[in-house]
Design a protein with these regions (language model features):
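Conserved small-residue packing positions in alpha-helical repeats and bundles
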Residues: 33-36, 65, 69-70, 118-124, ...
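Short solvent-exposed coil/turn linkers within tandem alpha-helical repeat scaffolds
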Residues: 51-61, 89-110, 137-155, 180-191, ...
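Bacterial N-terminal signal peptides
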Residues: 8-17
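Sec/Tat signal peptide C-region and signal peptidase I cleavage site
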Residues: 19-24
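Bacterial N-terminal signal peptides that target proteins for export
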Residues: 1-9
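Fold-core signature of tandem repeat domains
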Residues: 155, 163, 167, 176-183, ...
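N-terminal, post-signal-peptide region of Sec/Tat-exported proteins
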Residues: 42-75, 101, 199
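Helix-turn-helix repeat elements of alpha-solenoid scaffolds
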Residues: 37-49, 75-95, 127-135, 169-174, ...
Length: 322
């Protein structure tokens, strides 16, 4: 029994002695990976990464995930890695990553700076800057990553320029509203509003419909922006298009003989806030159609001699007697 106790003690001492050595070996492998990565030695990085045993990968899973992301950032310029980096950094920092850096005499701040510069480089070269920049910014906000104000401002500047370029090349309501929401006093607010105004005009020009005219005239953001300006570009052109649009609609209704609809649209034409007095170029043309529509509406009411007074009143107030 004494011998069994003695052996147990010996075994315990061996374990106490061996465990730190094993852990030191595992950490040493991680330190080498960081060194190869930091020194841009891609071949040694890849070979040692592939040889890493399962136990080391499991124990240092968070640190290894960060090293993999750094490899993808620095050597593969991966956009996905750029969005994954911030979360991976936070988890690895809570683990042993700072210790691994200290052992290799690599400044943690240098690792961060290099990663951030890589992300900026990848973002600037991206073909999808708008969604990509949003993903990067959201990733920073959702983690405790210690991003400084300089980097955050750089990201915002890149995103703002990307939104402007989007409005100039392929303007959409979504891009416009995003810019207004994120940069209400942005550097490019004038260009962005001008691009949206042009988009609204081109919609009307291509498809002169009631909905498109309403979108141009009733756009609150456009009204607010151009309120203090000398004039709104394309306003005269759109008024001219709307003037012709209403007149053509009246003409088509007249051919159908729908007096009620004609009367309504003529009233709309005369009183619409979208047109100035000078922009209503068809008033003379509509006078006859207007009185004709009134007469057609009057006809059903003239049923006997007593209702002839209605006709008399009509003749007193209307020019066209035929």
């Amino acid at each position: 029994m004494k011998r069994g106790i003695f052996l147990s003690i010996i075994l315990g001492l061996c374990l106490i002695t061996c465990i730190p050595q094993v852990m030191a070996q595992k950490q040493s492998r991680m330190e080498k990976l960081l060194r190869y990565l930091n020194d841009n030695d891609a071949d040694k990085w890849q070979k040692n990464r592939e040889k890493l045993d399962d136990e080391t990968q499991t124990y240092y899973s968070e640190e290894l995930a960060l090293l993999d992301v750094l490899h993808q950032l620095w050597n593969e310029h991966s956009e996905q890695a750029a969005t994954n980096y911030f979360g991976c950094y936070g988890k690895a920092f809570q683990g042993n990553f700072s210790t691994i850096c200290d052992e290799e005499k690599i400044q943690l701040s240098d690792v961060r700076n290099r990663a951030e510069q890589s992300i900026i480089y990848i973002l600037e070269g991206s073909k999808d800057k708008i969604p990509f920049s949003r993903a990067v910014i959201d990733s920073i906000r959702s983690t405790d990553y210690p991003a400084d104000s300089v980097m955050l401002q750089r990201l915002r500047d890149i995103r703002e320029l990307a939104l402007l370029e989007g409005m100039l090349k392929t303007p959409t309501p979504g891009t416009y509203q995003t810019y207004l929401a994120e940069y209400p006093n942005g550097k490019f607010i004038a260009q962005v509003n001008a691009a949206e105004n042009k988009r609204l005009y081109q919609l009307v020009e291509k498809d002169p419909s009631s909905g498109n005219f309403k979108a141009f005239f009733d756009n609150a953001d456009m009204q607010k922006f151009f309120r203090d300006k000398d004039s709104r570009p394309y306003l005269a052109e759109v008024r001219s298009l709307y003037d012709n649009f209403l007149f053509q609609h009246i003409d088509s209704l007249q051919k159908e003989g729908n007096a009620t609809a004609i009367r309504q649209i003529i009233d709309d034409y005369k009183h619409t806030p979208y047109l100035t007095a000078a922009a209503r170029t068809h008033l003379d043309d509509l006078e006859y159609l207007s009185e004709k529509a009134d007469f057609e509406l009057l006809k059903p009411a003239i049923v006997n001699s007593e209702s002839l007074s209605l006709l008399k009143d009509f003749l007193c107030t209307h020019h066209y007697k035929e």
